[in-house]
C-alpha cells in the first residue's frame, strides 16, 4: 500500500467571497476532511487559505473552494503547493487583514 502524500496548500480566492459566509464554508469542509490550517479575509476583498493534510483531501477542498457556498461568486482561485510542515493542530478563522502564516 502506497503511503498517503501530505502537503500544504496555499490558496487565494477572488470574487464575491466576503460577507457571504465563505470562511465558514471553508472551515466546515476543512474540519470535516480532517485538515489543519486557517482561512482569513484579505484587505483587497479576497479570501486566503493555508491548509495542510493529505494531498487527496486538499485536492477535494480545492474543488470546494472553486465552487464556494451558493451566495458566493468565485472568479478565480490561485493555488500554490508547498511541503507539509505539521504546524497546526486544528483549523481556524483568522481575523480580517491577516497576512503571513
Where are these regions (language model features)?
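Intrinsically disordered, low-complexity, mixed-charge
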Residues: 1-101
Amino acid at each position: 500500500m502506497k503511503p498517503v502524500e501530505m502537503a500544504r496548500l496555499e490558496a487565494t480566492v477572488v470574487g464575491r467571497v466576503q460577507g457571504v459566509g465563505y470562511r465558514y464554508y471553508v472551515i466546515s469542509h476543512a474540519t470535516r476532511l480532517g485538515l489543519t490550517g486557517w482561512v482569513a479575509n484579505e484587505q483587497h476583498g479576497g479570501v486566503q487559505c493555508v491548509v495542510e493534510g493529505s494531498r487527496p483531501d486538499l485536492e477535494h477542498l480545492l474543488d470546494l473552494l472553486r465552487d464556494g457556498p451558493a451566495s458566493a461568486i468565485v472568479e478565480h482561485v490561485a493555488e500554490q503547493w508547498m511541503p507539509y510542515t505539521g504546524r497546526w493542530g486544528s483549523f481556524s478563522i483568522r481575523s480580517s487583514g491577516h497576512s503571513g502564516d
